[in-house]
Amino acid sequence: MTDFYWELPSRGDGRRVASELNTRGGFGADRPATVATDLRPGKLGPFDELAQVIHAAELSGVDGVIAPYDPSGEESWVVAAAALRQTRHVRVAVEFHPAFGTPVYAAKMSATLQRLSSGRLEWRLKVETDPADARARGDQVTGRDRYARADEFLTVARGVWNDSEVLPGGFGGTGYEFAGNHYDVIDGGFRGILSGLPFPVVHLTGNSDEAVTLSAKHGDVHQFVLTDTGYETSARTLADRALEQGRSVRKLLRLPIIARETTDEAWARVERLWREAHPDGVSGDSRALARENSQWSGFDRLGYDQPIGLIGSYEDVARELSSFRHIDGFVLTGRPHIEELHRAGEHLLHLVDPAGRTLAGQEAHA
C-alpha cells in the first residue's frame, strides 16, 4: 500500500499567493464579509480553520499529516498535539530541530502524546535549518556537527525509551548511560506510564551524504525532494547503507501538486497564481518552467518551499506519481489546503494506489 502524507499549513491558508491576502488561520488582514449573516466578533478563532484542514485530512483518507517546523509560523508541537487530539486514525508527524530541547525532554513529551493518541505520533527531525534562524535561536552548532548532534539526539532518545512496560521505581531511571559531545545522561530511562509505548516513527530528510548516513542508522522513513539531479542515486545509497546495518528505510517523495479534472483547468489555476505573483510580467511565461511528465519547476515562485512539483489532470498526476521508482509513498501539499485535500481524496489517491484504496483492488489482493 502506498503511504500518503499531507503537509499542514503553518502560517494560515487561502487561495492567494501573497500571504497577507490569505485570511484563513488569522495570519492575513481581516477582510469584510460580502454577505453579513453574523457580525459577532470572535465566533471563529484562528485555530479553527487549521482544525478544519486536519479534519479534511482524516476525511480524505490520507495516512498522515505533518506539522512543519516554521520559525515564523505556528509551533509544530502544539499543532501536532491538537491534530492527535482531534483525529482518530491519521498519523501525525511533528517536525522539530535537535536544538528544540534535550532528547530526554522530547522523548518524554512524545511518550505522553503516544498515550494520548494510541501511538500515532511520528517525528520529522530537521537537522539543517536556515543560518539566520539558527542564530536567532542561539544555536551555535553548524556544518557537519549538526549531523553529529542529531546522531546523539536520536541515540539518547531511543536509549531512555522502554518499549516494554517497566514498573515505577521512585525517582530512579532504568540505568541508561550516555556520554557524548552534546549530551550526557546518567541513570536515564522511562518507567511507569512513560514506558511500554511505541517509539515515534522517525522521518529524516536531505539528499546529502551526511543526511543519507544518518538516515541509514536512525531513520524509519526518509523524505526526498525532486531536484535537477534526481533522487535515485541517494535512494540507492540509502538502501545499501541501511542494509549494511541490518535495517531498511521507507522512502517518501515530497511534492506540491495542482491537479484538476483536465490539464487545461490545472494550468489555468497555475496561470492565475503566476499573474498574481508576477503582475509586471517580467518573470516570463509560467509554461517555460514546464518539465517532462507533468513536472513544473516554479512552485517556489508561488510560495512553496521547493521548486518542483506536479501539474495536470488527476490521471496525469496519478500516472506520474505511480512512475517514481524506489518510492514507498508521498508527502503532498497544495493550497488552499481544505479544498486540495478533498480533491486528492476524491479523485487522486485511489488512482495511484487502487490495490489499497478501492474495494475491487482490496478484493483482488485478498
Language model: regions and residue ranges:
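Catalytic domains of carbohydrate-active enzymes, especially glycoside hydrolases
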Residues: 48-68, 214-224, 322-328
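N-terminal beta1-alpha1-beta2 module of alpha/beta enzyme domains
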Residues: 1-87, 199-200
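Internal, glycine-rich beta/alpha segment that forms the wall or movable "lid"
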Residues: 12, 16-19, 33-41, 105-218, ...
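Acidic (Asp/Glu)-rich catalytic clusters
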Residues: 55-59, 81-88, 110, 114-121, ...
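C-terminal helical cap(s) of enzyme catalytic domains, especially alpha/beta-barrels
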Residues: 142-146, 150-159, 233-242, 337-358
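Alpha-helix-loop-beta-strand connector modules within alpha/beta enzyme cores
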Residues: 76-94, 346-360
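Hydrophobic faces of well-ordered beta-strands that scaffold small-molecule active sites
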Residues: 4-8, 64-67, 90-96, 121-125, ...
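Active-site pocket-lining/capping segments in soluble small-molecule metabolic enzymes
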Residues: 10-26, 31, 262-311
